[in-house]
Amino acid sequence: DGCGLLLRKPDAFLRLAAAEAGIKLSGHYGVGMVFLNRDPALAAAARADLRAELAQEGLTVAGWRVVPINPDACGEESRKTLPHIEQVFVNPPADMLPEAMERHLFVARRRANQRIRARDPVYYVLSLSGRVIDYKGLVMPASLPEFYPDLDDERLESSICLFHQRFSTNTLPQWWLAQPFRYLAHNGEINTIRGNRNWAEARSYTFSSPLLPDMAKIRPLVNMTGSDSSSLDNMLEVLVMGGMDIFRAMRLLIPPAWQNIEHMDPDLRAFYEYNSMHIEPWDGPAGIVLTDGRYAGCVLDRNGLRPARYVITEDRHLTIASEIGVHDYAPEQVIAKGRMKPGEMLAVDVETGRLLTPADIDHDLKSRHPYRRWLRGH
């Protein structure tokens, strides 16, 4: 049912690829992976609409690059629905900060999606960001670098790599439903998905953020018909684009069983109790890996119903997977290894090289505001 890689943007490689395609990039830029219709007229219309929405957000399309692919790496059935795949490179104005560019890319992508997918369901933007890029499709894992020669190019380097192989249980295989999505990959099921989607839709008219002044542009906040994982990714993205960091957003969506942990730190309990008033848990068996391009991490559901094991090596590599042995390390290289516990979150900051343990993350979250006082006062 597909697989993929979500990478921290491999800047050096993408600049070389853009230059080879005659595309001039600014100091910071966005790049999108786009599934287009194989009908040239529909593909051209989609490009034009996406360009128009980007222009509305003050962004300029620097150019399009046809992504090299090898259809022979696909199975017979996946070749029947194989889309045309291109990368779009986007330059911001000189005075637009990278964080602002991310939000403008987000709004433009959402608006273009509303315009295009109603007439062309093949169209899909895998990622459109200045921080990450997503390579995925309906291929077997061993065939992914054969399908995408970019991934077999030694010039492509990244400090974050999220991999997922999908076995769908509630949707039919489709190119766009392969994982990872734009922020996360999910092993499990969201058993509360119908309620989560309905509440997200019902509350969308009360959500507000000064960073997203016109929320109507991005509704619906989550898709109502795709996989549960894709809807969870939608919700996480909305929270992050609205100004919430990835740690608080993820702990709102996938909290631990804080009500039943007898000896939980009172300040940490207050954090979860306060935030539980804003959004319901997206509950069910869940092992999630995620990244925003700076932080990469893993979180387990409150019951720990999906496995997650980690290995840390002396050359400062962190590997988290559902099984030990995904990557072969010599025993003398390993400085720490273990199993994540129910409700825990583990992460790394690749810009500082800091490992963020579950205790580090909890301490940061509980210390941001006087949650206990707020609860007593209200």
Regions found by a protein language model. Name each.
Residues 1-378:
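Conserved short alpha-helical segments that host acidic/polar catalytic motifs at enzyme active sites
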